[in-house]
A protein has these predicted regions:
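Trp-centered recognition loops
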Residues: 1-5
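Generic beta-strand structural signal
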Residues: 8-10, 252
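Short, solvent-exposed beta-strand-to-loop segments that form ligand-recognition rims
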Residues: 11, 15-37, 42
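Hydrophobic residues embedded in beta-strands of well-ordered beta-sheets
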Residues: 13-14, 46, 257
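Short beta-strand segments
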Residues: 24, 47, 281-283
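Ligand-recognition surfaces built from glycine- and aromatic
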Residues: 31-72
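A structural boundary/capping signal
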Residues: 56-409
Length: 409
């Protein structure tokens, strides 16, 4: 990646550098006011990341003490020293084998460098997963920032975006939509305006050309491209509604995810008439289709009978786990078991007792011949529920793993 830096000074002077090398120094007094942005042309194609602007950029927050500690811990992976003339002569004295010896050492250093890169990636992923788990740890649903948690899923795979920028972007979208509300509008009118503004005016829409692309599950890319899956578009709708003081929840139906607004008074109905009357006091939003629908249309989208569906709000933790399961499926289609394992690791960090995800991870470990890890997951399943009818095939696989040399814990 090349580092591009542009500085615009008060006297109209514009300084542009590439990799800290000044390439443009001009004065243009006509450019006053306006906005800072990034212009990307189709030809030639280019990619950008870490776009930032500020009056002054802060210096690195890395503490020397931390650097020393990290390098001390990893010094066995790398070694380097400058060579003087005397050292060079000693190498020359070795003779014709010296070049090959240096080449071999170079390959060793490359391998060590690769090991450090992998370690860095793993540590970064684990830190993000820990942050995601913490974001979902609140017992009160209102305290969970669903958009932040969804953005952290994208952060697992892509570190090169500023998460807070997207939270601010959501705030800005909500403010823009709020400006369209009539002064004395009620919640139902505001929900309809939110639907119209987000999907008709702003152009957010369901992805149809490449539905299973991972970008549709990355909230930062969904917000950039204004295109996504039913669940990611619904999350954006829910979070914008929350910023507009509208109580909208997720509605996780089989095969399709929706958003739902339910009027406060509907919660006070007697149990006998709850199902019949609640439908009259709710608004169901199909974010993928960009429209308001009723229960009959929701049932049609799932292919199930309406009486077989539970129109109950989905907990935020379950919404995040559903996003991760989507990514597990996408990685499976792409024959990417490493990514599958990463997403399953995240699900199990959120819900360690998720038996289906643990069994799925055990099978992936088994296929990858990581037998001890597979055995660890299988033992967890057997010990956590000894009477489960699903245990017999697990015991068969366990015996097979031990015969193949996996160590029992």
């Amino acid at each position: 990646w090349n580092l591009l830096h542009v500085r615009f000074e008060e006297n109209g002077r514009i300084l542009c550098s590439v990799n800290k090398q000044l390439v443009i120094d001009v004065i243009d007094l006509e450019k006053e006011g306006g906005f800072i942005g990034l212009c990307k042309f189709r030809e030639p194609t280019a990619s950008f990341r870490n776009f930032r602007f500020a009056k002054r950029f802060s210096s690195s927050q890395v503490k020397p003490k931390s650097v020393f500690k990290l390098r001390k811990l990893t010094r066995n992976l790398s070694a380097h020293r400058a060579l003087g003339e005397a050292d060079l002569q000693q190498i020359l004295d070795i003779g014709k084998t010296a070049p090959q010896m240096l080449q071999d050492y170079s390959e060793e250093l490359k391998q060590r460098s690769d090991d450090l890169q992998k370690l860095s990636k793993e540590i970064r992923e684990r830190l993000v997963i820990a942050e995601l788990v913490e974001s979902l740890s609140y017992s009160d649903e209102k305290s969970i920032d669903l958009l932040k948690s969804a953005l952290l899923i994208a952060r697992i795979d892509n570190e090169h975006f500023n998460l807070n920028d997207y939270l601010k972007k959501a705030d800005a979208l909500a403010d823009q939509i709020k400006s369209e509300f009539p002064k004395h509008s009620n919640d139902e009118q505001r929900i309809k305006i939110l639907v119209s503004q987000l999907f008709n005016e702003m152009g957010f829409h369901g992805s149809t050309l490449d539905f299973h692309h991972r970008s549709n599950s990355y909230m930062n890319e969904v917000m950039d491209d204004r295109e996504g899956l039913p669940i990611t578009l619904s999350i954006l709708f829910i979070e914008l509604a929350d910023r507009l003081n509208l109580k909208v929840t997720g509605l996780g139906l089989p095969g399709h995810f929706l958003a739902m607004y339910r009027k406060p008074q509907s919660l006070e109905l007697d149990q006998e008439n709850l199902t019949r009357n609640t439908a009259k006091h709710e608004i169901i939003i199909d974010a993928f289709g960009g429209k308001i629908i009723d229960r009959q249309e929701a049932a049609r989208l799932t292919g199930l009978a309406i009486e077989d569906l539970a129109f109950e709000p989905s907990p935020k933790k379950e919404i995040i786990k559903r996003m991760l399961r989507n990514l597990v499926q996408v990685a499976g289609r792409e024959k990417d078991p490493i990514s599958q394992t990463r997403y399953l690791d995240t699900i199990l960090a959120i819900s360690p007792d998720d038996r289906y995800s643990r069994a799925q991870r055990a099978m992936i470990y088994y296929i990858r011949e990581e037998f001890e890890r597979a055995l660890s997951d299988i033992d967890y399943l057997l010990e956590s529920d000894p009477e489960s009818p699903e245990n017999q095939p697990l015991r068969v696989i366990r015996n097979r793993l031990i015969n193949q040399g996996a160590a029992a814990f």
